[in-house]
């Protein structure tokens, strides 16, 4: 009997929270699944994982490794890094 009471109480509290934060949940889902949302940024045509500019699985994954080799060079200044980023962006 205690388990059933605890379960019903948990469901009631969960229902209360869900109805009070409906707009918040909708905003979170819109942020994740929307046109410019997080998932589109990761998996879309210009996403980070599989897109053209994707550093992990994109068409230019090997050239991005070259960029990482330069990025960890301690002798580069911030201006050098900006110029290098622009070169690799246009490459």
UniProtKB/Swiss-Prot annotation:
Keyword Signal annotated: yes
Main location: secreted
Modification type Leucine amide: residues: 33
GO cellular component terms, semicolon-separated: extracellular region; membrane; other organism cell membrane
Residue ranges annotated as propeptide in the record: 37-91
Further remark: Shows a low ability to inhibit hepatitis C virus (HCV) infection in Huh7.5.1 cells.
Annotated protein name in UniProt: Peptide Ctry2146
């Amino acid at each position: 009997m205690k388990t059933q009471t605890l379960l019903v109480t948990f469901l009631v509290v969960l229902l209360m929270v869900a109805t009070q934060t409906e707009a918040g949940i909708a905003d979170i889902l819109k942020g994740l699944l929307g046109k410019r949302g997080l998932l589109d940024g990761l998996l879309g045509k210009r996403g980070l994982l599989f897109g053209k500019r994707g550093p992990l699985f994109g068409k230019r994954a090997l050239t991005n490794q070259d960029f990482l080799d330069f990025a960890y060079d301690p002798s580069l200044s911030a201006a050098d890094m900006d110029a290098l980023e622009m070169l690799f962006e246009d490459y």
